[in-house]
């Protein structure tokens, strides 16, 4: 029996898994830029940054595993996509970045040690071994994250959130940057899209499905019911958090001058509110947020790769990916960000369209036709966005692409992909007659 307590614990686990350190440091800059339009901007941010991943989570939980999204593609294409996805969000890019965020934004500001390659290595080893201890057995992930880490993280965030609304640092100023020129809702939508949490939802859907299975919940209708209930808990928590972080950014003019990212704004704000204690609060929030995401993502990666061979079990992959994360994290945060974003720009649109295709799959007259052509077009246009980010896109292609809607926002793929899907449906109906 799945009790109300189980739903709340599962919902808190989902919340913590999605709440990486990046999700905490990104909204304050958006709130600062949105100014007195912060509330509208935060609504747009929540739609694409919270609701889209929530829908993906429900879809994947019903399917049972993220790889079921690719079942209508050629096997090589599905395996290639999922391998790239798990490596990008896992130990090749995102998890080393998470380790570096914890080191540079939580550990170093405490002033306990000097920054050096040796210090970074020691921190990375200890941090990742602690995470590995929580996930070496897959059955402990939900209890560890949902019952232990999340409550501690929520307490710290609640203290900051309440204080921000009770004692804001500054008056809210006029919007700037993209928010001064465009609709706050639209800009917020694009900003929420850039969290790219749909990728994480594909990985975490399997964790939710296994958590439900452990409670003997296998009926598809019950899976949908409980996933929506638990997911709703996480949606409320994430929505409230983003709302508070946008307000923090909007009222940060006194400390935001010269800040280059939301992490700096968040850190300065917390330090201004709490003094020396603020540094420790910041360290606690970033450490717990980083740890929960590291545990969830690496666990999902280990589960996926363990299916390829009985010789290499889940514990083997956890140890392997932990070692890989530790080694790659020595390259530093700046270098990792430089290669992470182009990789994400390449696979994120594919992930979104796979979810869209799954949602309408039963209505497609020719499933294979729609999947093949829609994903092919999505790959082509997402490759353009990726090459543009690397500054290696040929000038001739750039001159053509500037005429496409949303190209400047990194969303050149969206309209062509949706149009291709519609055309494939019409063609499928014609062929089936």
Regions found by a protein language model. Name each.
Residues 137-148, 185-188, 208-237, 254-267, ...:
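Hydrophobic, small-residue-rich membrane helices and short re-entrant helix-turn-helix hairpins
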Residues 61-68, 127-149, 214-217, 327-339, ...:
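Membrane-water interface regions at transmembrane-helix termini and the short interhelical loops
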Residues 67-71, 241-291, 298, 342:
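TM-loop-TM module centered on a large, flexible mid-protein loop between adjacent transmembrane helices
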Residues 9-19, 127, 163-170, 179-245, ...:
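Hydrophobic, membrane-embedded alpha-helices of multi-pass small-molecule transporters
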Residues 134-164, 340-352, 371-379:
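Membrane-interface loop-to-helix entry segments
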Residues 91, 95, 154-180, 198, ...:
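Hydrophobic alpha-helical segments and their helix-loop junctions in multi-pass secondary transporters
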Residues 51, 55, 152-164, 198-200, ...:
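Selective recognition of specific alpha-helical transmembrane segments in multi-pass small-molecule
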Residues 167, 367-433:
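A generic transmembrane alpha-helix motif of multi-pass inner-membrane proteins
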